[in-house]
């Protein structure tokens, strides 16, 4: 097996060597949890990483691991007054041969960098981001679920304005933190098809913040998702705010479609968050499965007309969750793949990406970051 490791801006490809018994013993001393039945919820772990930005210094400090999971701040902190916060989500997991790894953390670092710029926050260098992830996972190795359980160690890096702000303006000082928590699948049914609805709410405005990972985007979706769950739907599909004719994404995942010609179709919009999972699945489709990929605007009417045989959601949390049925204001649109099992193309995409992540298939250069 070969794994590509990013070191700073370099990428190097080398064989993963078997661990000796001492190394394996360290990794196998796991916490006593029911790994196969974990929910998608917060569990406090041992260490978290913290770094601070002071305007007077003009740079981020070196950062460090700490034990304390509490944050003390002013009642007038920028994040509390004007929601000046951005975040990321990624996972650490155990490969088939016992190594602990993360998946493409440099891309999460770049996305956090871009998100920070959009909200007038000092961006954290990507190299420091990757190092912070490495430190947190290594310090919490006992919390990384064993291979084959379906669980992972979810990592939540986030940044926010911490200094007092009373007028509408950016904060001066900022706090960056990464915590880790073991989680089960985002959707409890795993790869079982889900039932979603078309919502009348908007997720993002044209030329707004839909293409960054800002907390405010998710706050706006909370009412819609609570309402959807009460009505028996797993998620909301948001349409473009300008014309309300094109599908964009859900509150927590990007959308993938397979048309009648077996092309993978990716909705195109400046309001869609650039998903790292989606980007990876596009590569898998083209280079592993030989699929043609079309990135273009996708109209809701196309789905109603039966132009797509499979539809699914993808993201760090969901990986791929197939959609079996879509409710459009009381009218059900049933996909050809149905509600019983994942469709063949979504299944191939999902199992191939999981095979790459878990070390069963050779990964493209730079995709796998080895912790230990």
Where are the language model's segments positioned?
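Conserved phosphate/anionic-ligand binding catalytic regions in large, soluble enzymes, centered on
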Residues: 74-90, 320
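Active-site- and interface-proximal helix/loop "cap" or "latch" segments in soluble metabolic
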Residues: 87-89, 93-129, 273
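Conserved catalytic-core subdomain
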Residues: 20-46, 188, 242-372
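Extended Lys/Arg-rich, glycine-bearing segments that form polyanion-binding/interaction patches
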Residues: 34-37, 108, 113, 119-231, ...
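Active-site-adjacent loop/helix segments that line or gate small-molecule/cofactor pockets in enzymes
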Residues: 42-56, 78, 191-239, 345-372
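Short acidic-glycine loop/turn motifs at beta-strand connectors
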Residues: 50-60, 93-98, 105, 162, ...
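N-terminal amphipathic/basic-hydrophobic helices that include classical n-h-c signal peptides
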Residues: 1-25
């Amino acid at each position: 097996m070969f794994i590509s490791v990013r070191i700073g801006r370099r990428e190097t490809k080398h064989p993963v060597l078997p661990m000796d018994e001492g190394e394996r013993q360290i990794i196998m001393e796991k916490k006593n949890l029911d790994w196969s039945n974990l929910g998608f919820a917060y569990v406090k772990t041992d260490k978290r990483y913290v770094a601070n930005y002071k305007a007077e210094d003009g740079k981020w400090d070196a950062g460090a691991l700490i034990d304390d999971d509490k944050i003390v701040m002013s009642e007038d902190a920028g994040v509390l007054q004007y929601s000046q916060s951005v975040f990321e989500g990624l996972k650490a997991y155990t490969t088939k041969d016992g190594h602990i790894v993360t998946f493409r953390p440099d891309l999460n670092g770049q996305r956090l960098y871009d998100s920070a710029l959009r909200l007038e926050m000092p961006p954290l260098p990507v190299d420091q981001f990757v190092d912070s992830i490495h430190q947190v996972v290594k310090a919490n190795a006992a919390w990384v679920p064993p291979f084959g359980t379906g669980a992972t160690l979810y990592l939540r890096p986030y940044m926010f304005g911490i200094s007092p702000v009373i007028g509408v303006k950016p904060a001066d000082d900022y706090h960056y933190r990464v915590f880790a928590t073991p989680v089960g699948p985002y959707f409890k049914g795993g790869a079982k098809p889900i039932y979603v609805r078309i919502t009348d709410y908007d997720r993002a405005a044209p030329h707004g913040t839909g293409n960054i990972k800002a907390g405010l985007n998710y706050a706006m979706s909370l009412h819609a998702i609570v309402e959807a769950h009460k009505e028996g739907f797993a998620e909301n599909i948001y349409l473009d705010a300008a014309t309300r004719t094109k599908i964009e994404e859900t509150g927590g995942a990007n959308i993938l479609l397979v048309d009648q010609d077996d092309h993978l179709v990716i909705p195109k919009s400046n309001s869609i968050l650039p998903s790292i999972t989606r980007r990876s699945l596009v590569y898998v489709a083209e280079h592993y499965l030989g699929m043609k990929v079309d990135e273009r605007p996708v109209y809701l009417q196309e789905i109603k007309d039966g132009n797509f045989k499979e539809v699914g959601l993808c993201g760090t949390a969901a990986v791929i969750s197939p959609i079996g049925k879509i409710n459009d204001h009381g009218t059900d649109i049933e996909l050809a793949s149905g509600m019983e099992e994942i469709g063949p193309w979504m299944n191939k995409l999902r199992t191939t990406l999981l095979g790459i992540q878990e070390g069963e298939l050779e990964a493209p250069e730079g995709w796998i970051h080895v912790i230990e």
